[in-house]
């Protein structure tokens, strides 16, 4: 009985629920929900409004949060999209693996800037700043905490310019957490 990664399917949702409960993440939700330059001056979302942004099935254009790297019909040119998914799984030992989660934050070129503390800033830079402030060190259902640390994974990084470079752009942030268990018992002996 070795690591079966039993917590793996739940971690993206756990991350989102954690973000929805954190008061310090309100600006992050506003960046996602409101497309305007003054997005941060808009009202906070309720917990239910935040979770209603999650796409579950069917047409995607009404939603802003996805647990898959493939988003087929959510139009990034006209709104912000957040994708949270496991990017890389590295087996460290029999009972423990490092899982790297990707956070893709996409938005149209016309909404690239927001006002923050009276100055124009990059929506992508502010997303990375707010995500790091809330998630770096968060308990999300793994073994230990979600971290931005090269010692945990060489994939822990942030980078700009994802998208099609013509009508939408964005940023990517990679955070890692250990996931492990003693597995589920299968085999000839069971």
Regions found by a protein language model. Give the residues of each.
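Aromatic/basic-lined ligand-recognition segments
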Residues: 183-185, 189
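Hydrophobic residues positioned within well-ordered beta-strands of beta-sheet architectures
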Residues: 82, 99-103, 171-173
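Short acidic, glycine/tyrosine-flanked loop/strand segments centered on an H-E-D-like triad
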Residues: 96-115
């Amino acid at each position: 009985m070795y690591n079966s990664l039993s917590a793996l399917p739940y971690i993206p949702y756990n991350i989102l629920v954690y973000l929805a409960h954190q008061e310090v993440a309100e600006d992050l939700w506003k960046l996602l929900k409101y497309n305007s330059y003054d997005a941060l001056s808009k009202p906070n979302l309720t917990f239910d409004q935040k979770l209603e942004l999650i796409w579950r099935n069917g047409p995607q254009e009404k939603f802003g949060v996805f647990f898959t790297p493939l988003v087929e019909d959510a139009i990034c040119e006209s709104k912000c999209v957040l994708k949270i998914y496991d990017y890389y799984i590295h087996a460290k030992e029999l009972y423990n693996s490092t899982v790297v989660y990707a956070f893709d934050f996409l938005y149209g070129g016309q909404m690239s800037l927001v006002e923050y503390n009276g100055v124009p800033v990059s929506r992508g830079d502010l997303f990375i700043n707010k995500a790091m402030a809330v998630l770096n060190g968060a308990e999300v259902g793994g073994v230990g905490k979600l971290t931005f640390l090269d010692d945990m994974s060489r994939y822990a990084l942030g980078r700009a310019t994802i998208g099609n470079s013509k009508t939408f752009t964005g940023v990517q942030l990679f955070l890692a957490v250990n996931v492990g268990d003693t597995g589920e018992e299968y085999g000839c002996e069971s």
